[in-house]
Amino acid sequence: MQMQVLTAASSLPRATLLRPAAAEPWRQSFLQLQARPIQRPGIMLHCKAQLQGQETRERRQLDDDEHARPPQGGDDDVAASTSELPYMIESIKSKLRAARNSLGETTVSAYDTAWIALVNRLDGGGERSPQFPEAIDWIARNQLPDGSWGDAGMFIVQDRLINTLGCVVALATWGVHEEQRARGLAYIQDNLWRLGEDDEEWMMVGFEITFPVLLEKAKNLGLDINYDDPALQDIYAKRQLKLAKIPREALHARPTTLLHSLEGMENLDWERLLQFKCPAGSLHSSPAASAYALSETGDKELLEYLETAINNFDGGAPCTYPVDNFDRLWSVDRLRRLGISRYFTSEIEEYLEYAYRHLSPDGMSYGGLCPVKDIDDTAMAFRLLRLHGYNVSSSVFNHFEKDGEYFCFAGQSSQSLTAMYNSYRASQIVFPGDDDGLEQLRAYCRAFLEERRATGNLMDKWVIANGLPSEVEYALDFPWKASLPRVETRVYLEQYGASEDAWIGKGLYRMTLVNNDLYLEAAKADFTNFQRLSRLEWLSLKRWYIRNNLQAHGVTEQSVLRAYFLAAANIFEPNRAAERLGWARTAILAEAIASHLRQYSANGAADGMTERLISGLASHDWDWRESKDSAARSLLYALDELIDLHAFGNASDSLREAWKQWLMSWTNESQGSTGGDTALLLVRTIEICSGRHGSAEQSLKNSADYARLEQIASSMCSKLATKILAQNGGSMDNVEGIDQEVDVEMKELIQRVYGSSSNDVSSVTRQTFLDVVKSFCYVAHCSPETIDGHISKVLFEDVN
């Protein structure tokens, strides 16, 4: 099933650009379009000065278009936001830098603050007074207008009631703020019945354990609540059932997530439990559980932990603290998926270095060095660290597997959608040396996610995010190897909820470093700039295509657009236009020449024509170019122009050599099966256009690492081109088993791109190989209709 967002091109404003000329060309990739009958072009005689003059005029026209053309739709707000992008980037940088020493940027929990407020003064000599009067003050300052406490931006009845009950109990315990206490109590009385209608998919963590304990405290204080309400009877029953399932010995034997809700339990052996404190002094990073333990034990480290928390949060405390690992990893993930991570390379590297130091062989926790690890944070760390070149073993997932099933936390009562989603994403970054565990993890997570999608149940127990179902569907429909950066970003711009997303702990909370409106504004402005530039480049490319009469060689306008899209979807940075356009023009011209050579292959004359083209390209034989073969002549002129546009000096010779090698792959026997050679031509062109190849060409020729990258890319793309042809009506010979073979080679390619310790080849050049291979994977994976939907979405549909 394709995602709804990937609509057919015919429904979008630029549909005329995307309509196929005929059914058959739709079934071909930009690599292997079959030729239509060739219409002989007229004689095209240009000298180099004319070509350069034409290009100068083209560029002037581009400049005129850019200044004259308003943003698509004439949206002044969009224009304003794009002009403000540098300021937004600086603001985000400042926020990321300010958080570098933070233990987590999260909102305060009224519930946890209430438990802190309940702590009696430890050195009071028997006199009752609050140990943390700042917590009382925070409660008094943060009551909502309707009398409740909780998340002001989203109403979930469990969140509002447990926060409100906790605050009312705290105020009543110390006999302060009577008016606010009365308003809170009235809110509880008016809304208690709603518990019977609450959605259990979004239950607050440990609610059935902790809410009854607060009710008991309220009853002892004589607060007027209907303790026999039917909704409460159900919660009491769930509490008894859950407590009966918790072996007392297991609770005290090792650190588990049960430590997070200790305030809801009784008859505890504190001497044994205090062994499981986190390095920061807390019990499982829970202020509420730590406050309860402090009341019972007077432990100095618990006291210091709570003092640190309320000092950092102006008298309050979050529901979980610290969350430094989670905060850093998820913010990096969001910036990457929003397509703006390139602006924050140093900040991201610092965050990932921090995460790497906190990753243990058993995995990672959400905060500090908490002994209880979880698969969610482990998966995010594994994926991001591997993609940034860190040496991370796949054995970190072994801790979360039992009898072929995977869990987020040991002893969990239900599976988390987002934990399996993030684990599925991580399981696709596989190296050849990894054991079968990652493949097993991928299969398990995919089966789980597919089952949830089939039943329409794509909500999660830890986050409320409207875009989550779409995120999961995209991950299932487009594996990492076939997901292009600009496609993923364009879709994610509509999935990312920014500040509207809420996380679920013992109450709702927000992660301001993860879900940030400024991220979204900056990403939209950045993408709008990309679209503006892409539309101008597309107009220029179309003029080039028409001027060189490439339509006469069977190249349709649609295939030109697809070639540009594949280049722009991978290489999208504004300062890399030469690489992007070099890729696109090379793909288009390769298709035109391939179409011409196929005409000769039909009568066994491809070898001779190939030799003549190579001779004309290498020798600048202008007499030969004026021969009667006008089709070949026009292609040589176009090729000459391409080289002049994208290469200078020695780089020009390198680009001619790249084309020569590509032409040499054409023989009567090959019948145009040159997908691997075309991939290498694209890689070489991109590197030459970037200026990287010329400066390192000699060393690369002697590099075994570079040679192996070429071998892998050529092999993979040759297989994928064969698959594309078979899907589109070509021969089915040698197609069986291609996917498995490509997957094996992809493992080695991923390792050579992200896990190599060799310095022979730059990381950017390695990424070029991967970009080109992924573009082949994308074409092989997607239907023509899906590709055209992506073209419309990425290039022509404005970001709202």
UniProtKB/Swiss-Prot annotation:
Keywords attached to this entry: Chloroplast, Isomerase, Magnesium, Metal-binding, Plant defense, Plastid, Transit peptide
Keyword Cell wall biogenesis/degradation tagged: no
The UniProt record lists the keyword Membrane: no
Protein residues bound to Mg(2+): 374, 376
Residue sites binding substrate per the record: 242, 461
One of the Pfam families matching this protein, by short name: Terpene_synth
SUPFAM superfamilies associated with the record: Terpenoid cyclases/Protein prenyltransferases, Terpenoid synthases
Segments of this protein annotated with the region Disordered: 52-80
Name of protein: Ent-copalyl diphosphate synthase 2, chloroplastic
Organism expressing this protein natively: Oryza sativa subsp. japonica (Rice)
UniProt lineage: Eukaryota, Viridiplantae, Streptophyta, Embryophyta, Tracheophyta
